[in-house]
Amino acid sequence: MKKLGIISIEDSSAASNLEQSNSSRRILVVDDDNDVRQLSVDVLIDSGYEVEAAKDGAAGWEALQTYDFDLVITDNKMPRMTGIDMLERLRAARMTVPVIMATSHLPTHEFASKPWLRPDAALQRPFSNDDLLETVKRVLRGYDSYSAHINLLFSRYL
């Protein structure tokens, strides 16, 4: 399978250690910093998540149009397309995947004028492995709760 700008990450040695609840979760990590991207990917894989990685916002947007993800973790300042630009496209396309913005400078001025661009969570860089995993778990729990509520509401009308 050819993926332009997307780095597919799989680790068969981690497969035996997968947490049951995480094994079906697919996360997209978007970051132009190779070290941060690879460390994030490794931590998530070791915790049982299926992970895809993109080297910038444009590659991340391409992945979002091609594959289904349960969560996106993105930097903001990247070449070709920023994390905010990718988030704006995601929201305009009415994609409901939750987004964690992992950045050293969160552009709060953007959120003041465009509140719909707020990510579901922010992760201040540099961040620890524990901070990353706790934020991922918190956002996924919140999204699961929201999805269950929506499904319950719609089940009454179907």
Where does each model-flagged region fall?
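Alpha4 helix (beta4-alpha4-beta5 surface) of REC/receiver domains from two-component response regulators
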Residues: 85, 106-123, 130, 134
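Hydrophobic/aromatic residues positioned on beta-strands within the core alpha/beta folds
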Residues: 102-103
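Short hydrophobic/Thr-rich beta-strand motif most characteristic of the beta2 strand and flanking loop
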Residues: 48-55, 63
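Active-site beta3 strand of CheY-like receiver
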Residues: 67-73
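Receiver (REC) domain active-site loop signature in two-component systems and cognate sites
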Residues: 78
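Charged docking surfaces used in two-component/phosphorelay signaling
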Residues: 38-46
